[in-house]
């Protein structure tokens, strides 16, 4: 009895196991068949729509020109071939391909509409079974934080719309719920994937805007380039000008003023020659005047420090008279001493020597001082204003002391 009961138990267990395995295998096989059928249908539909849209676009752009020969035949044959393909695969113009699985949408006018990147990625997410079967990507903490704000009651309208408008979501929902996943897990995973896709699109848009702003900021306009070029060209020039600006000379200069025109008009018979002055190292004009009334005249006072003026006058009788050598030697010595002193210590007050056209004598004038040149010229005129009696007295004195002067003159020579 015990052995019969054990054998019946084993047979019933094996039969039940076989039945359950067979049922599960049949269900799995049926599920795989449906997936393969749907996949083949989608691929066939996508291929047909893509070929039809491409053929229509190429046919519209290809224009047969009025040329002759082989080129015209080739273009016409290609146009006919594309027309046949378009007529075979394209739907009628009054129907629109209502399909969410392609990126090209046919319109009644025969044109196509392209999906953007966001729509294409959303379709790929909706038609991928891994979106609903696998755990969400990323950190689990982020998914848990998102679940804290998840409310399926607020998503009922959106869920109903997705089941109506999206065949891929409707097919996957029918297959997977409740066999593979629960109703709540199916929609939680889907909407979290959509949430991640939206975040990714937001980051992509932010990066694109930042790149556009950086490109616009790095591209200078023509006006900015010209301003930079002008500024770069003018700055070194200004620096060079500031560097090489010559300051006003600090060394005093000597000015020689010669009233030659007035002298030539007033004294046409006068002959003038120039002799360098030892003290001031300037040129002072000396005028020699032929006058029979004056034999010789020497100034009793020195006109200016370091200068020597000698005037020779010849009488009409033809007598050659020379001035006393002793005073001349003393003056020469004084002038040499003053010249050495002035070379060691340059004078701070520079004088300008002018040729006086009225008296024929060189008169010093202070540069920048009022009344100095006029006073000195008047003193000189007073010194040279001699009467005839004074001249005769001077001549007699010279004749009396002629011997002494001759000896002094020889010594001086």
Swiss-Prot record:
Ranges of biased composition (kind: Polar residues): 297-322, 356-375
Matches recorded under PANTHER family: BSD DOMAIN-CONTAINING PROTEIN 1, SYNAPSE-ASSOCIATED PROTEIN
Cellular component GO terms held in the UniProt record: cytoplasm
Low complexity biased stretches: 274-287
Residue ranges with Acidic residues bias: 376-386
Domain BSD: 146-198
SMART domains attached to this UniProt entry: BSD
Protein name: BSD domain-containing protein 1-A
PROSITE patterns, per database record: BSD
Biased amino acid composition, Basic and acidic residues: 208-219, 255-271, 342-352
Gene assigned in the entry: bsdc1-a
Annotated region described as Disordered, given as residue ranges: 208-228, 255-386
UniProt organism field: Xenopus laevis
């Amino acid at each position: 009895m015990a052995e019969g009961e054990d054998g019946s138990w084993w047979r019933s267990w094996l039969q039940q196991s076989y039945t359950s395995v067979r049922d599960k295998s049949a269900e799995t096989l049926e599920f795989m068949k449906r997936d393969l059928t749907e996949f083949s249908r989608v691929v066939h539909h996508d291929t047909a729509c893509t070929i039809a849209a491409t053929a229509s676009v190429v046919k519209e752009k290809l224009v047969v020109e009025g040329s002759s020969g082989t080129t015209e035949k080739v273009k016409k044959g290609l146009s006919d071939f594309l027309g046949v393909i378009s007529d075979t695969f394209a739907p009628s113009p009054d129907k629109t391909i209502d399909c969410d699985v392609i990126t090209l949408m046919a319109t009644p006018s025969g044109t196509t509409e392209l999906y953007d990147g966001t729509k294409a990625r959303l379709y790929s997410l909706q038609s991928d079974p891994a979106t609903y079967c696998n755990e969400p990507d990323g950190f689990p903490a982020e998914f848990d934080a998102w679940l804290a704000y998840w409310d399926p009651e607020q998503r009922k309208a959106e869920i109903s719309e997705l089941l109506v408008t999206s065949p891929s979501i409707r097919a996957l929902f029918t297959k997977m719920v409740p066999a593979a996943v629960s109703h709540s897990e199916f929609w939680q995973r889907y909407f979290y994937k959509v949430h991640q896709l939206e975040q990714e699109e937001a980051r992509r848009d932010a990066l694109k805007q930042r790149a556009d702003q950086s490109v616009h900021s790095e591209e200078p306009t023509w006006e900015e380039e010209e301003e930079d070029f002008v500024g770069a060209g003018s700055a070194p020039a200004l620096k060079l000008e500031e560097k090489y600006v010559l300051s006003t000379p600090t060394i005093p200069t000597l000015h020689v003023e010669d009233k030659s025109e007035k002298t030539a008009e007033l004294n046409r018979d006068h002959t003038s020659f120039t002799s360098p002055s030892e003290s001031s190292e300037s040129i002072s004009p000396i005028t020699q005047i032929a006058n029979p009334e004056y034999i010789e005249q020497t100034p009793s006072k020195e006109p200016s420090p370091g200068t020597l003026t000698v005037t020779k006058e010849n009488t009409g009788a033809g007598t050659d008279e020379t001035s006393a050598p002793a005073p001349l030697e003393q003056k020469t010595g004084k002038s040499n001493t003053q010249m050495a002193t002035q070379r060691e210590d340059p004078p701070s007050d520079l004088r300008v020597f002018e040729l006086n056209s009225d008296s024929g004598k060189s008169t010093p004038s202070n540069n920048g001082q009022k009344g100095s040149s006029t006073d000195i010229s008047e003193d000189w005129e007073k010194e040279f204003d001699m009467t005839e009696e004074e001249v005769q007295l001077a001549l007699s004195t010279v004749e009396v002391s002629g011997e002494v002067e001759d000896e002094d003159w020889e010594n001086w020579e």
